[in-house]
């Protein structure tokens, strides 16, 4: 099991990134909540990781905090929840927001996540309620720190943001509309994704 990687951020193409560790490039998939906290390409970064072994591939998932990784592990233990849906849930909601959603049994918020229908949301809330009792007193994740990406043009940032939303399960039309509705100019793709998800969820 690969539990942690420390290296240089070589590439960042949401929701994937390449982490260079002593000359070896590890492809890692991350939730958007982790992506927002990543430094610029070329900077050092440490990720807490979870390895999924399948017959056709070994897949690495990375997280900025151990708490995020533990949430991911809790989610994929649930019946019918795979890594893709777990990442979609974690991209749409911060850890604390998801915990509060479960405590309040709030299906209306969960159904806004791609891949989550009403029945799935109701089942997730029931199954997670007892599991999340221990999470109430855990330390919260550090505030998000956005890194500027001066080299990115608006058009490429928009394209990256749309691609990331589609990878999370949103329909192309939904992703394009959400990104187009983001206010402001010269935003990084990470900020566009964050604002678009906020508007959709």
Swiss-Prot record:
Top-level division of the source organism's lineage: Bacteria
Where do the record's region annotations for Flexible linker lie? 144-152
Cell location: Cytoplasm
Among SUPFAM superfamilies, the record links this protein to:
DNA helicase RuvA subunit, C-terminal domain, Nucleic acid-binding proteins, RuvA domain 2-like
Query: Would you tell me the Gene Ontology cellular component terms?
Result: cytoplasm; Holliday junction helicase complex; Holliday junction resolvase complex
Q: Which HAMAP family match?
A: DNA_HJ_migration_RuvA
State how it assembles.
Homotetramer. Forms an RuvA(8)-RuvB(12)-Holliday junction (HJ) complex. HJ DNA is sandwiched between 2 RuvA tetramers; dsDNA enters through RuvA and exits via RuvB. An RuvB hexamer assembles on each DNA strand where it exits the tetramer. Each RuvB hexamer is contacted by two RuvA subunits (via domain III) on 2 adjacent RuvB subunits; this complex drives branch migration. In the full resolvosome a probable DNA-RuvA(4)-RuvB(12)-RuvC(2) complex forms which resolves the HJ.
Q: What is this protein called?
A: Holliday junction branch migration complex subunit RuvA
State the organism of origin. Answer: Pseudomonas aeruginosa (strain ATCC 15692 / DSM 22644 / CIP 104116 / JCM 14847 / LMG 12228 / 1C / PRS 101 / PAO1)
Protein encoded by which gene? ruvA
